[in-house]
């Protein structure tokens, strides 16, 4: 009888093995979730601690390791015989303008190389070279823009995030005589777009901050799900000045976009799994260059390996005005706003690195 009892116990255990496995996995997940909440609370991050459950489950779905794996897959070299077929399929499926691509598509060795392709400079003229004007830094959707009136920026869904936290430093004016205001513009680059980003006006920068973070998607639904999405995601900020005053130029990582490159900044390494995330207490990597790095309007600044977001926060004269609409599709070099009538130069196009 005892033997039969033991056999029955083993039978019931075997019968319920999936339930036991599920309960065990769920227990580990809940334990990790509790520890994650403790970390956010320990670092006095009350805003993130309140939404720690959302952040935890978003991490499970969109972990940084997944983006690294995707990145490695996209780097895999495609045999010459298959390149035309694969790239022509992507061009047709994603509605990419083939005529704008600078180099023959068969010259791209991998899907990652194709997504970071260059376009022909003459297809992107500079729409305004006058002082105090701004042009689009990228091919993108202009999802939000306006005047920045406090340290909180309200995005298109009505959710606010702290600009100082986003920049990793306190933003401040260069001119304190009441003649200027701060303005901002947020751009979303979809995967099919040209992935390099350029200078929206003539400016110079001396400080680069790398703020390690998550790689959550930046589509509109995520803004509502996570209040301060841009303060959570990994980003690189260039701080400098231009004709109108101070400027902050930010490139933000997103899901499958773990790689941000800035021209002539070989020390910058993004999506490094050894870095403790800044919003969880990790340090902000700040590089101060020996001298200012100057860029002219339309000059290439860097690139993503897939689509993501650019945020430009800039000081300018009070009479600056926009001439675009929210959610408008814009091309790099296209005029977004200025003072007075635009000034164009013949044969003035964007510049890519040689």
From Swiss-Prot:
Binds 1 pyruvoyl group covalently per subunit. It is a single-pass membrane protein. It is found in: Membrane; Endoplasmic reticulum membrane. Protease activity is inhibited by PMSF. Pfam families: PS_Dcarbxylase. Its main location: membrane. The record marks 307-308 as: Cleavage (non-hydrolytic). Its EC number is 4.1.1.65. The modification Pyruvic acid (Ser) is found at residue 308. Heterodimer of a large membrane-associated beta subunit and a small pyruvoyl-containing alpha subunit. This is Phosphatidylserine decarboxylase proenzyme.
């Amino acid at each position: 009888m005892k033997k039969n009892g033991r056999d029955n116990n083993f039978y019931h255990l075997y019968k319920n093995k999936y339930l036991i496995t599920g309960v065990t996995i769920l227990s580990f997940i809940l334990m990790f979730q509790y520890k994650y909440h403790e970390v956010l609370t320990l670092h006095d991050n009350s805003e993130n601690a309140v939404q720690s459950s959302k952040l935890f489950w978003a991490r499970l779905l969109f972990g940084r390791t997944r983006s690294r794996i995707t990145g490695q897959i996209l780097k895999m070299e495609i045999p010459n015989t298959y390149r035309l077929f694969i790239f022509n399929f992507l061009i047709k499926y994603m509605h990419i303008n083939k005529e704008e691509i600078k180099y023959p598509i068969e010259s791209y060795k991998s899907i990652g190389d194709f997504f970071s392709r260059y376009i022909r400079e003459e297809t992107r003229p500079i729409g305004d070279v006058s002082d105090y004007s701004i042009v689009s830094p990228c091919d993108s959707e202009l999802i939000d823009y306006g005047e920045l009136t406090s340290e909180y920026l309200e995005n298109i869904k009505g959710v606010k995030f702290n600009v100082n936290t986003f920049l990793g430093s306190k933003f401040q004016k260069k001119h304190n005589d009441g003649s200027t205001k701060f303005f901002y513009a947020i751009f979303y680059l979809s995967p099919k777009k040209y992935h390099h980003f350029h200078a929206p006006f003539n400016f110079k920068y001396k400080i680069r901050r790398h703020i390690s973070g998550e790689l959550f998607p930046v589509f509109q639904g995520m803004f509502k799900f996570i209040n301060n999405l841009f303060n959570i995601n990994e980003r690189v900020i260039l701080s400098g000045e231009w004709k109108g005053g101070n400027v902050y130029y930010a490139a933000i990582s997103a899901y499958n976009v773990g790689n941000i490159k800035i021209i002539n900044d070989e020390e910058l390494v993004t999506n490094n799994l050894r870095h403790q995330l800044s919003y969880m207490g990790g340090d902000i990597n700040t590089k101060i260059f020996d001298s200012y790095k100057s860029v002219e309007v339309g000059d290439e600044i860097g690139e993503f390996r897939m689509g993501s977001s650019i945020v430009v926060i800039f000081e300018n004269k009070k009479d600056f005005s926009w001439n675009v609409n929210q959610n408008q599709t814009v091309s790099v070099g296209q005029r977004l706003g200025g003072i007075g009538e635009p000034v164009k130069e013949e044969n003035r196009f964007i510049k890519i690195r040689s």
